[in-house]
From Swiss-Prot:
GO molecular function terms listed in the Swiss-Prot or TrEMBL record: ATP hydrolysis activity; ATPase binding; proton-transporting ATPase activity, rotational mechanism
Subunit architecture: V-ATPase is a heteromultimeric enzyme made up of two complexes: the ATP-hydrolytic V1 complex and the proton translocation V0 complex. The V1 complex consists of three catalytic AB heterodimers that form a heterohexamer, three peripheral stalks each consisting of EG heterodimers, one central rotor including subunits D and F, and the regulatory subunits C and H. The proton translocation complex V0 consists of the proton transport subunit a, a ring of proteolipid subunits c9c'', rotary subunit d, subunits e and f, and the accessory subunits ATP6AP1/Ac45 and ATP6AP2/PRR.
Taxonomic classification: Eukaryota, Metazoa, Chordata, Craniata, Vertebrata
Name the record gives this protein: V-type proton ATPase subunit G 1
Compartments, as annotated in UniProt: Apical cell membrane
């Protein structure tokens, strides 16, 4: 009977060691999965940052050319406004004098189509 209980003890110890090995293997597997997941996330993040950087560069190139056109149009508009202001200042007095002359200088005349019935 002692040999039987000794055999049972050996089986129990072997089962315990096997369970420990299985448990240790599961822990290693979980660590490897976790590490692989972290590496994959880091790689995805790096790729996303690279693509975002490329997008920003293309966006800046596209908007940069559009921005220079806008600046050019604004500059041209300011130049034209300056010219118009200069013309206005030069001709203002003359136009006002002519306008006042036409309004204030009234010469009554009989229209040529008017007939005197007599």
């Amino acid at each position: 009977m002692a040999s039987q209980s000794q055999g049972i003890q050996q089986l129990l110890q072997a089962e315990k060691r096997a369970a420990e090995k299985v448990s240790e293997a599961r822990k290693r597997k979980n660590r490897r999965l976790k590490q692989a997941k972290e590496e994959a996330q880091a790689e995805v993040e790096q790729y996303r940052l690279q693509r975002e950087k490329e997008f920003k560069a293309k966006e800046a190139a596209a908007l940069g050319s559009h921005g220079s056109c806008s600046t050019e149009v604004e500059k041209d508009t300011q130049e034209k406004m300056t010219i118009l202001q200069t013309y206005f200042q030069q001709n203002r007095d003359e136009v006002l004098d002519n306008l006042l002359a036409f309004v204030c200088d009234i010469r009554p005349e009989i229209h040529e189509n008017y007939r005197i019935n007599g």
